[in-house]
């Protein structure tokens, strides 16, 4: 029976609250099909060739060369007499007892046109008359029924241009699903990073200040992985202001990524002034006129993975000079902000990092570090460079991280003392569904982050990402809380404590202990498949909870949260114990 040795007398360091940040990137199913209340894919009809992607259309013409006619400056369609458009999707889901709203923005091209739209069998009909206006908004509400995989239709008698459509729960929160927000609330994120990630290079913050129906869709077709679940486009239904409202609702600190590609110094200065400026400033006044007090965003990421996707800023000198320009301009708007510069540990980009740092001449507060254990999301057992389940069992076994070793021992060898690291993206892999193996990897990774302050100067961390990539699985009208979400929730009991040394005489137990004065809190990860009973040398166990998983694989996702009566941790599972002397 393994003994746990707790070295309270040796002291330690404060467990950082900021280990529990998350990313909310506009990508894949994180927003559309996840956080967003919108149920219609490609609702502004931007994506597609001869027909708009995701829509079955009859008697129509797709207009691609007259974007200024559309209120959102997108592509649109003209439906001839008897023409129709239809979309069927698992995202179209309603529940009995809830109210929903359907909208369409149209322009009759005959003297009158009859427009019928809504859920199949629940459509309402409007007769619209040409009046010289650029568009006519149509709107109605209806009571839901229990429906999964629904169909939305729009048909025309006469002729009309259709610019955009919408279907969502009427009780949305700034365009977001309240049930997903409540599930996020239970995770207790301390900070939220937005809009990416790679999406930052496709997000026009000024565009996102318009009313949602006027926002030009974002084109992500240059990155196959970015908007892959929404036909390489995003309709920008959730913008900067909505993001801040979410942070306030969740009592989470907002963090923002400024694009090296989209922002020069003046644009970045205006952005910071809009977010943090006094109402007497030009852009602070614009924010105040929209009804928002200062956002007080403290941490700003300057660029994201420019070495991979930076276009002209894949050149390290150009990236450094633009970074200097942005930081100087941003701190002109608000000298109190903190900035994080974008670096990498990747073997093929280490010369890039050395060259980049040669040209950085502006003070910064953090260096960014992205930590994915696997490489591609669609492989699991060693293919395409993915870490195997066997390799995962030995991750961080000695508290060592070769990527951060590069930062400490090479890149900043002579100047690491003041460096603070922000692990602003971490997970087993981006774009991957929850599984028992992913949970196990996340548990070891979160332990490492919590214990890495002294060795690697880790001050902050942001999980990538909670919605549909490991924590919360959203399908139709349901939201499932996954094992990693429970891990985050239970690990919160370490907050406010002092991390103290602890060890075991069993090599397969990974331990983290915090001292809270009147009690200790201990989390234990079992690296192997054999259940292990433990003793805690004279401490009374007052609470004992386990996240117990089933088969250890990327294909299995069975787990339970169990109140244990004894200190036993099962294979590839995590045990949490509150201890009293």
Features from the language model and the residues they span:
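An active-site-proximal structural segment forming one wall of the substrate-binding cleft
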Residues: 169-189, 236, 243, 263-302, ...
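Carbohydrate-binding surface patches
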Residues: 507-539, 572-578
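Noncatalytic carbohydrate-binding groove/subsite architecture in carbohydrate-active enzymes
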Residues: 149-159, 316-441
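Aromatic/acidic polysaccharide-binding cleft in carbohydrate-active enzymes
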Residues: 18, 26-27, 419-511
